[in-house]
Amino acid sequence: MILTGKTGIITGGSDGIGRAIAAKLASEGAHVVICARNADKLEAVAEDIRAAGGSVETRVQDVADTKSFTAMIADVASSNGLDILVNNAAHVGFGSIADASLEDFRENFRVNVDATYAGMQVAIKAMSNNCGSIVNISSINGDRAMPGMAGYSSSKAALLHLTRLASMETAGLNIRVNAVTPGPIMTPGTEAFIQSDPKAGEAIAAGIPMQRMGMPEEVANVVLFLASDMSSYVTGANIPVDGGKANELAVNQG
């Protein structure tokens, strides 16, 4: 197991991509601390991880409350040490610049950027002697302008730049900071949407070079690589997990 003896925090760990990441890291020997706002969902994830032989604890946490969020990270670090931080929790806001209120716009940044910044700040101090890894989950919409998602797209673009900046500031500390940018992924929310509108699902898949949506486990596999020593010389990277969609966009826009 490549993460034996490591402790990792996964935000937004109660569902979808975060759930898959938690299960994957635990399956490779990490003690995972999963946090989210829904206690029942967290415990369901924890039960599955324990049933598979993994080590897990849960923390009910709203990452937008940065004071309590950073206190939680510090508490985990003081109790178990901290080797891995996966900033996965996200707010997905809809609305164009003309329509979305400034408050709606800011909510995307509070969760997607402010919480990540605050979490990294504490994690970097905790990891300074641990050769740690921070993985920020961005989005394909951070690589391109996405009409109708002004706040979300802008915040995910900011997250990518923050990742690059943090990687430069921490490289001398032997802490690696990388990003993963998922494309369309078959999360429970996406699955519910497709069930309500099958034609929309077909259209999404048809627009992906690999002709299908990704699975949460496929994102988790990349996070495992970045969290482990397999990527010991990788920092500041942005790895798309999107079935080739980003390359298609680059060709079309070029």
Task: State what each model feature region is.
Residues 139:
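Residue(s) in the substrate-gating loop at a strand-loop-helix junction
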Residues 7, 14-15:
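Conserved glycine-rich cofactor-binding loop
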Residues 125, 168-172, 232:
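Alpha-helical segment proximal to the catalytic Tyr-Lys
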Residues 86, 171, 176, 234-236:
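Short, small/polar-rich loop/turn modules that mediate ligand/substrate recognition or access, typified
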Residues 120, 155, 163:
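Active-site helix of classical SDR
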Residues 96-97, 104-109, 204:
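Substrate-binding pocket helix/loop in short-chain dehydrogenase/reductase
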Residues 144, 224, 235-254:
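Short C-terminal tail/terminal secondary-structure segment
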